[in-house]
């Protein structure tokens, strides 16, 4: 896929960048190479470079070339406002590049946590399910909420205008990144049909992101995933209780069916019935 944008834009996309020598400076290429072996995020496009891009607003163009294999969808993020950082994650014999794209307004929150949360998710899911098969895993900043595509996730949350942020905002950012990056496995890699069986998308992923979140921070979990919530899901008027095998266009009890009930059931299976061992 080739994406032509103004020369001062930075682009992140599904797939591996094929022409860094045409779209990055020599220094940025060196930073990208350094990031592959770094245990901490390395700035590929710095704050100063992003602010300079924002000022220039050139009319010249350049083309970013990406290559992706075995994907069912595609996405990209492009902006002249983007700061770009990255770090390598060892998955089997491969190095996966965990990366984030965000504006300066998202700092210091994003610079401190976004790429680390991506790397944590890639490592954790690979150990508990199967190795992540793609070369990159991306978190791109948006205004709110989250959405996933192969190799690319869009995630909300940013600090206040003065740069401060609450513990809730920090955990919200980390939680949504873990969840959306987790969707790279379910449904993107396994290729389940989330429109028909939403629980096989959101439910399996919510179970996994609950484990990954607790591994990051013991307080990073959603209360509806606790085992005792099974009572809430089962009691009440039986005529109003919808089965989890309900298509996604039915929004009645959507949150419980797609997210909560499958996660609680899997937690009970893991912790109570089978045991973690």
Question: Which role does the model predict for each range below?
Answer:
Residues 2-178, 207:
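Hydrophobic helix-coil surface modules that form long, contiguous segments used
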Residues 131-140, 193-196, 219-222, 277:
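Surface-exposed patches in mature extracellular/periplasmic domains of secreted proteins
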Residues 2, 179, 269-277:
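Short, intrinsically disordered, charge-balanced linker/junction segments flanking boundaries
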Residues 103-113, 194-195, 252-255, 268:
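Second-shell loop/turn segments in exported
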Residues 181-197, 211, 215-217:
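Catalytic Zn2+-binding segment of zinc metalloproteases
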Residues 93-97, 153, 178-185, 232-246, ...:
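Active-site-adjacent bridging/hinge elements
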Residues 202-264, 268-273:
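Acidic/His/Gly-enriched intrinsically disordered linker/tail segments
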